[in-house]
Amino acid sequence: MSGRLWCKAIFAGYKRGLRNQREHTALLKIEGVYARDETEFYLGKRCAYVYKAKNNTVTPGGKPNKTRVIWGKVTRAHGNSGMVRAKFRSNLPAKAIGHRIRVMLYPSRI
């Protein structure tokens, strides 16, 4: 079986009010999701921000490489247009705004 076990999303920014932004919650726009009821499937799914850094790090069961991951979880819907909120283990860096996030198709709730 080949194919990816994740769908594409864009990190749109942080949860915010008019004057304050809360960096502990990220807003994600999932590709192909345009209504609030369509986000129901993605709630509880794991998400990952994959990026490359300057130095190698040891990967379990593999060679050291420059790839790193920040893991998170989709927590709830945001608005009526298919955006979702996600919490990551460490807050996403601001340079990640506009970049790709992987929303994994697990754990399954079906």
Swiss-Prot record:
A Pfam family the protein falls into: Ribosomal_L35Ae
Source species taxonomy: Eukaryota, Metazoa, Chordata, Craniata, Vertebrata
Function comment: Component of the large ribosomal subunit. The ribosome is a large ribonucleoprotein complex responsible for the synthesis of proteins in the cell. Required for the proliferation and viability of hematopoietic cells.
Location within or outside the cell: Cytoplasm
Keywords associated with the record: Acetylation, Cytoplasm, Ribonucleoprotein, Ribosomal protein
N6-acetyllysine modified-residue sites: K8, K63
GO cellular component terms, semicolon-separated: cytoplasm; cytosol; cytosolic large ribosomal subunit; mitochondrion; postsynapse; presynapse; ribosome; synapse
Gene Ontology molecular function, alphabetical: structural constituent of ribosome
Coiled coil start-end: none
Family note: Belongs to the eukaryotic ribosomal protein eL33 family.
PROSITE patterns: RIBOSOMAL_L35AE (PS01105)
Modification N6-succinyllysine occurs at: K63
GO terms of biological process kind: cytoplasmic translation; ribosomal large subunit biogenesis; rRNA processing; translation at postsynapse; translation at presynapse
Protein name: Large ribosomal subunit protein eL33
Quaternary structure note: Component of the large ribosomal subunit.
Main location: cytoplasm
Protein source organism: Mus musculus (Mouse)
